[in-house]
């Protein structure tokens, strides 16, 4: 068994990856990267999504591409930013659709931990990024980890996969659609939100699918303020 990297059932699920030669290469690459330049998130938050949402608690996956690459933003959860950080444009659009869809009042922070605590795995396909260099760690080995997570959840079944944009939708072949439910649309980025994201009602559709699976729906309303006890 590999050293516990996450601290919950994901360690066992991902053990074949964590004990592989390719992951060892990724680990060595990251050690050098973190020691020589600014990488986001900090190394203590790389596995935040997995830590907050154990395998056996995951009901929903919202798949992103890679972390935000500017200071004070990335926290290990896709689309989420640290409290106090300016809301990224994509997240502003997510909040707009959230209000239009289920009436959730937009908040002034982008800290999505409440979703993760309810079983929403906020997963980026690539878990680290160099400062100012979007997709800078693509193809270095993270995809093996996150693809394995998607496959394991798909095999277990009764998971709602929310896939925004072409990159996320390229993961559809990993998902057994007879046992899971896929919600897809254009990306919430300002460049594409008007081409199908707005009006797609992903949050209410997700909850309908969860109810059909016999699961408790997600309370999408975020707290107005983030308490210190909620910080990870």
Curated annotation (Swiss-Prot):
One GO molecular-function entry: uracil DNA N-glycosylase activity
Species lineage: Bacteria, Bacillati, Bacillota, Bacilli, Lactobacillales
NCBIfam families: PRK05254.1-1, PRK05254.1-2, PRK05254.1-5, ung
Uppermost EC category: hydrolase
Compartments, as annotated in UniProt: Cytoplasm
UniProt entry keywords in alphabetical sequence: Cytoplasm, DNA damage, DNA repair, Hydrolase
Any GO BP annotation: base-excision repair, AP site formation via deaminated base removal
One Pfam short name: UDG
Similarity section: Belongs to the uracil-DNA glycosylase (UDG) superfamily. UNG family.
Catalytic activity: Hydrolyzes single-stranded DNA or mismatched double-stranded DNA and polynucleotides, releasing free uracil
Residues annotated as catalytic: 66 (proton acceptor)
One of the record's GO cellular component terms: cytoplasm
Protein name: Uracil-DNA glycosylase
Function, in words: Excises uracil residues from the DNA which can arise as a result of misincorporation of dUMP residues by DNA polymerase or due to deamination of cytosine.
């Amino acid at each position: 068994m590999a050293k516990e990297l996450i601290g919950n059932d994901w360690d066992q699920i991902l053990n074949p990856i964590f004990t592989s030669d390719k992951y060892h290469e990724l680990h060595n690459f990251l050690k050098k990267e973190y020691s020589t330049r600014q990488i986001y998130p900090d190394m203590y938050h790389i596995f935040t999504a997995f830590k907050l949402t154990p395998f056996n608690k995951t009901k929903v996956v919202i798949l992103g591409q890679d972390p935000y690459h500017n200071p004070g933003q990335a926290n290990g959860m896709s689309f989420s930013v640290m409290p106090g950080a300016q809301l990224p444009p994509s997240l502003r659009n997510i909040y707009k659709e959230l209000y239009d869809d289920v009436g959730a009042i937009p908040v002034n922070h982008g800290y999505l931990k409440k979703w993760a605590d309810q079983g929403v795995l906020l997963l980026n396909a690539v878990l680290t990024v160099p400062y100012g260099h979007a997709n800078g760690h693509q193809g270095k080995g993270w995809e093996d980890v996150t693809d394995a997570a998607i496959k394991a959840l798909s095999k277990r079944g009764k998971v709602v996969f929310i896939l925004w944009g072409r990159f996320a939708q390229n993961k559809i072949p990993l998902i057994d659609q007879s046992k899971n439910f896929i919600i897809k649309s254009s990306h919430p980025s300002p460049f594409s939100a008007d081409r199908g994201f707005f009006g797609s009602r992903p949050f209410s559709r997700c909850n309908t699918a969860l109810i059909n699976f016999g699961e408790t729906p997600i309370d999408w309303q975020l707290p107005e303020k983030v308490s210190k006890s909620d910080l990870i």
